[in-house]
Every structure is written in C-alpha cells, then in structure tokens.
Amino acid sequence: MSRKNKKIKKKIFIDTRYNSRIVAKFANRMMYDGKKSISESILYSSIDLLADKLEDSDKMAVFYKALDNIKPLVEVRSRRVGGATYQVPVEVREERREALAMKWIIFAARKSSGRSMKEKLSNELLNAYNSTGAAFKKKEDTHRMAEANKAFTHYRW
C-alpha cells in the first residue's frame, strides 16, 4: 500500500456557454498567465469557426468527436529492469486520455503557421475530426511505439 496521501482532485467548474466540463478544461489548458477570458474567447470563436466550416452538423458533437479521435488508448512508460531500460506499453486512464488529447491539439495548433490562434485551433480541430493533422499523427506514433514494444508488456507494474 502506498505511503503517500492521495491527491485531492480540484473541482473543475463547468463552462458557462456550453455547460461542459470538457470545454472548461480545454480553456484552462490553453490559458497563459491566468488570462482565462482570453482563452475562453479564443476557444469559443474557434468552435464557431469550426461550425461554419461544417455547416450541417452540431458544433459540440464535432468538438467531442475531434477529441475522441485524438485520445490515445495505450502509451509507453520507461521501466528499468536489471540495468536495461524498457519501453513498456501501458493502457491509459480516461482522464489522462482527455488531458493528452487536449494537450496534443493545443500544441499542434500553436506549432502550425496561420494568422490567429482561433483559426489555427479551428483548423486543428477540423483535422482531428477528419482523423488527420499533427495531433492525430502524434496519437498514431504513440500507438505505433506501444505496438513495437508489445513484447515487454509482462514488465508492467
């Protein structure tokens, strides 16, 4: 049994516009220097831009599907056994899946070239919805790495 105290989870307030915990977490993850209102306005306008590009569908359904397409199922963790370090594939918890998907989408949007962050983010969300783009490539690379190291699954802890 662990000697450490269990970490108390912070209560994430739901988003005011879409009444969604996931949208609120996404805005928090995008935030720089505590400027949440700027982060929220960028996110809302990029979701609206995304809805304009896909005019026939529900914008929140598109947002959630884009996140689901990026969520990784497995990842590799380093495990030291007898002087050698192995990359051991481990299944990812649901909360971490969400966090990684958000992180990868935001990182890909920031790295891409474009005029404004709302346009870059809406393009990356559209790419994620269509299972393309840099964030989807990151997920595929993670899955490929886990598949390549499948022989070391018995080192799981």
Swiss-Prot record:
Entry keywords, A to Z: Ribonucleoprotein, Ribosomal protein, RNA-binding, rRNA-binding, tRNA-binding
Cellular component per GO, a single term: small ribosomal subunit
Origin: domain of life: Bacteria
Entry keyword Cytoplasm: no
Molecular function via GO: rRNA binding; structural constituent of ribosome; tRNA binding
GO process terms (BP): translation
UniProt-listed Gene3D superfamilies: Ribosomal protein S7 domain
TM ranges: none
Pfam families: Ribosomal_S7 (PF00177)
Record SUPFAM superfamilies: Ribosomal protein S7
PANTHER family xrefs: RIBOSOMAL PROTEIN S7
Function, as annotated: One of the primary rRNA binding proteins, it binds directly to 16S rRNA where it nucleates assembly of the head domain of the 30S subunit. Is located at the subunit interface close to the decoding center, probably blocks exit of the E-site tRNA.
Family statement drawn from the similarity comment of this UniProt entry: Belongs to the universal ribosomal protein uS7 family.
Quaternary structure and interacting proteins, as annotated: Part of the 30S ribosomal subunit. Contacts proteins S9 and S11.
Name of the molecule in the record: Small ribosomal subunit protein uS7
Phylogenetic classification of the source organism: Bacteria, Pseudomonadati, Spirochaetota, Spirochaetia, Spirochaetales
